[in-house]
C-alpha cells in the first residue's frame, strides 16, 4: 500500500512504506530539501546491467539515504556492495527499521553488516543521528 506525504514545497509524494513515510517526516521536520526516488544509479552485476533507485536524495549535501525494513538476502546485500564499489565517492547511508535485526539468511545484524561494509547507518528511531547527518558540512561539489 502506498503512503502519502508532503515534501517541503507542499507537493504530495507517494512513498512505499511506513518507514519511508517516517523518514520523509523527519527530513521535512528538519527543513532539509529532499527528493524521493529521483536518483537512479546504473550498476553492473558481472555480465548484466541493473538500475537501483535511491529512496531519498539530499542534493545540497550529496547524501543518499536508503530506508530498509529488512535486508532480505545475499543478493540484495550484494547490490549495495556493488553500488559502493562502482560509485566510490557516493555517500549512501541506511536508515533501518531495526539495526539489530538479523539479515535474511545470515547470522549478523543489519548494523553489523553496514559497519563491515563501511556504510553509515542508524535506526528510524535515531532522529538525532539523522539530524547530525544533515548538519554535516557538505563534501559534495
Regions found by a protein language model. Name each.
Residues 1-141:
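Nucleic-acid endo/exonuclease domains
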Amino acid at each position: 500500500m502506498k503512503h502519502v506525504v508532503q515534501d517541503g514545497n507542499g507537493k504530495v509524494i507517494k512513498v512505499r512504506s511506513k518507514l519511508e513515510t517516517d523518514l520523509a517526516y523527519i527530513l521535512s521536520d528538519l527543513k532539509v530539501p529532499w527528493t524521493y526516488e529521483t536518483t537512479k544509479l546504473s550498476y553492473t552485476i558481472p555480465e548484466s546491467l541493473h538500475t537501483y533507485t535511491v529512496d531519498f536524495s539530499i542534493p545540497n549535501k550529496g547524501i543518499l539515504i536508503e530506508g530498509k525494513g529488512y535486508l532480505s538476502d545475499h543478493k540484495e546485500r550484494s547490490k549495495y556492495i556493488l553500488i559502493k564499489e562502482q560509485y566510490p565517492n557516493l555517500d549512501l547511508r541506511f536508515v533501518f527499521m531495526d539495526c539489530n535485526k538479523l539479515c535474511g539468511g545470515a547470522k549478523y545484524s543489519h548494523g553489523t553488516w553496514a559497519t563491515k561494509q563501511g556504510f553509515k547507518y542508524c535506526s528510524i528511531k535515531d532522529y538525532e543521528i539523522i539530524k547530525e547527518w544533515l548538519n554535516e558540512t557538505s563534501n559534495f561539489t
